[in-house]
Swiss-Prot record:
Protein localization: Cytoplasm
Every MTTase N-terminal domain range: 5-122
Family: Belongs to the methylthiotransferase family. MiaB subfamily.
Keyword Glycoprotein attached: no
Domain of life: Bacteria
Enzyme class: transferase
GO CC aspect terms: cytosol
Binding site for [4Fe-4S] cluster 2: 163, 167, 170
SMART domains in the cross-refs: Elp3
Binding residues annotated for [4Fe-4S] cluster 1, in chain numbering: 14, 50, 85
Protein name: tRNA-2-methylthio-N(6)-dimethylallyladenosine synthase
Cofactor: binding comment: Binds 2 [4Fe-4S] clusters. One cluster is coordinated with 3 cysteines and an exchangeable S-adenosyl-L-methionine.
One Pfam family of this chain: UPF0004
Length: 464
């Protein structure tokens, strides 16, 4: 009997890439591939790449350099593929810069991987970065029950891809294409199958997830709020999340879902990028800081216990000290539970790359450090406010010490507990007893029997 071929997939960047990597693995499982955690042991290595920042793209070439050396040292015939947004943006240039690469495949062509690999085995080098007319989701197989169980009680489900916003700093519209939404029936079908296989929490993902406008079973276009309501009716699906959102698409129906659906977790990632109206206009965000504050006020009125996270870019071309102070002010006023902050990175082909007033790395680094201080203080305050609170925790994986398990709070915080009799995929009610820099610790009070709800007791609003 022939031994199975081994597959190693490494994901860079966003949750969409994690999801896509899983779907590629599912497709290749049908071709006899089994996953390995060791690239040196693999017959096929896939790097699923991110192009959002220059540093992310350069990581890929560093990884390819390591793979080239390892392949030469071992004398192996490992097939090396580059997928994702770097593949889409750079295409055949990747093979010129890294001749070790056998296959370059863009995000819309993953369902064609088996036929591409057959061509590689015939000695060809393959580049496929087209936007095919067929929907890749119609052709990618669902994960097996064994694969779902191995991935744990949480899962991602893509509901839309692409972006029509054309922020001046961003490559996503060029690498992922226009906004396209899946049909409600396909999303619900995928979610039901995951729940039947033991998944208890689903995160809906998309480049601009709250721009979702899929066809409903009634033939009408449904927004994300109505989709969430439909998914909340799946028996056994205890938690729902979604990411990443744009303020322009935060409509009243979606805000009402936060008010009405206990399964929808009280934690929202809503990138703002800057607190300066002038910079927001230059970024083509098409909203100002006051609109952002209004959205936050509506969300907190609808769901008083909601917590927020965000993304920030510092050092955008032309950003003055006054612009940056506006960003610090917004961060302090909102009080984010968590946030990601980055220095502006020139992305070739975007309008901002042609801007005359690029800032020095020294200025960008200094501003990033100042913003990080504010955001870290806000996160610490939020975490400390959790002391003594009672949360329902979904147990996801073993801890480092015997008997320990690690779960997630409604706010995505890691929570370390000792829970005799409980296992991965179970919910336990926990009193938070300690706050660390990267996780919380808690004392188990009891098991949660009603897994169709997030909590059997209301959470208290927190101020960071």
């Amino acid at each position: 009997m022939q031994e199975p071929r081994k597959l190693y997939v490494k994901s860079f960047g966003c949750q969409m890439n994690v999801y896509d990597s899983q779907r590629m693995a599912d497709a290749l499982a049908k071709e006899g591939y089994v996953e390995t955690q060791d690239p040196a042991d693999a017959d096929l290595v896939i790097l699923n790449t991110c192009h959002i920042r220059e540093k992310a793209a350069e990581k890929v070439y560093s990884e390819l350099g390591r793979l080239r050396k390892a392949k030469q040292d071992a004398g192996s015939d490992t097939t090396i593929a580059v997928a994702g947004c770097v593949a889409q943006a750079e295409g055949a240039e990747i093979m010129k810069r890294a001749p070790v690469v056998d296959l370059v495949v863009g995000p819309q062509s993953y369902h064609r991987l088996p036929e591409m690999l057959a061509r590689v085995r015939d000695g060809k080098r393959v580049v496929d970065t087209e936007f095919p007319a067929e929907d890749k989701f119609d052709h990618l197989p669902a994960p097996s029950a064994a694969a779902t169980k191995k991935r744990g009680p949480t899962a991602f489900v893509t509901v839309q891809e692409g972006c029509d916003k054309f922020c001046t700093f961003c490559v996503v519209p060029y690498t992922r294409g226009a906004e396209v939404s899946r049909s409600v029936s396909k999303i619900v079908g995928e979610a039901r199958a995951l729940v039947d296989q033991g998944v208890r929490e689903i995160t809906l993902i998309g480049q601009n997830v709250n721009a979702f406008h899929g066809e409903g079973p009634d033939g009408r276009t449904w927004g994300l709020g109505r989709l969430l309501e439909e998914l909340a009716g799946i028996n056994g699906l205890a938690r729902l999340r979604y990411t990443t959102s744009h303020p322009r698409d935060m409509d009243d129906g979606l805000i009402a879902a936060h008010r009405d659906l206990p399964q929808l977790m009280p934690y929202l990632h809503l990138p703002v990028q800057s607190g300066s109206d002038r910079i927001l206009a230059a970024m083509n965000r098409k909203h100002g800081r006051e609109i952002y504050f209004e959205i936050i006020d509506k969300l907190r009125a609808a769901r008083p216990d909601i917590a927020l996270s965000s993304d920030f870019i510092v050092g955008f071309p032309g950003e003055t000290e006054a612009d940056f102070e506006d960003t610090l002010d917004l961060a302090r006023r909102v009080g984010f539970a968590s946030a990601y902050s980055f220095k502006y990175s020139i992305r070739p082909g975007t309008p901002a790359a042609e801007h005359d007033h690029q800032l020095s790395e020294e200025v960008k680094s200094e501003r990033l450090a100042r913003l990080h201080q504010v955001l870290e203080a806000s996160k610490t305050a939020f975490d400390r406010a959790c002391m003594g609170r009672r949360f329902d925790i979904l147990l996801e994986k073993p801890g480092r010490l015997p008997g320990q398990l690690i779960g997630r709070s409604p706010y995505l915080q890691s929570v370390v507990v000792t829970a005799p009799g409980a296992g991965i995929g179970d919910f336990v009610t926990v009193d938070i007893t300690d706050v660390g820099p990267n996780s919380l610790a808690g004392q188990v009070v009891d098991a949660v029997e009603d897994r169709g709800r997030t909590s059997d007791r209301p959470l208290v609003a927190m101020e960071a």
